Amino acid sequence: MSRLLNEKKAVPRPTKVLLGLALLLFAPFAVAQNNLGELLDAGAKKISPDEFRQDVVHRTLVGPTLSGAQLELMFASSGVLQGRTQADAAGRAGAILTPVDGVWNIDDSGRICVSMIFGRTMIPFRCQYWFKYKDDYFVADAETDPKAKVLRRTVKP
């Protein structure tokens, strides 16, 4: 009896093949979000300080924080940044838009170092490497550690 039920619920072979192909096509997109090793395996490249200045500065970027709140930032060539987030003072996702102000620079290792103020909370400098995969940017605390978490930054149209 259970075999009869399984036969009625079975997915046709062509549907399975199409589903498998779809998963393979979207695998690099999904992989690029997990960690630095998978991002580099998918073909991402570390961007240089000059590439950061040319391709990122004066463009609005959006992406998640470590806590999952959405962040929108614009780096100015003067070394300041401005934006907004939907996070509370503790960095947790919230419903209220909070202004973000800060400063940025590039250290001797080519990392982009950022200090931000969320409302009245100051976040100390954090230096990260920036990578590019297709049209998106990713930030990571490490340059080569394959297990390092990456956060996506998408250029806002």
Regions found by a protein language model. Give the residues of each.
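Segments that shape or occlude catalytic/ligand-binding pockets
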Residues: R13
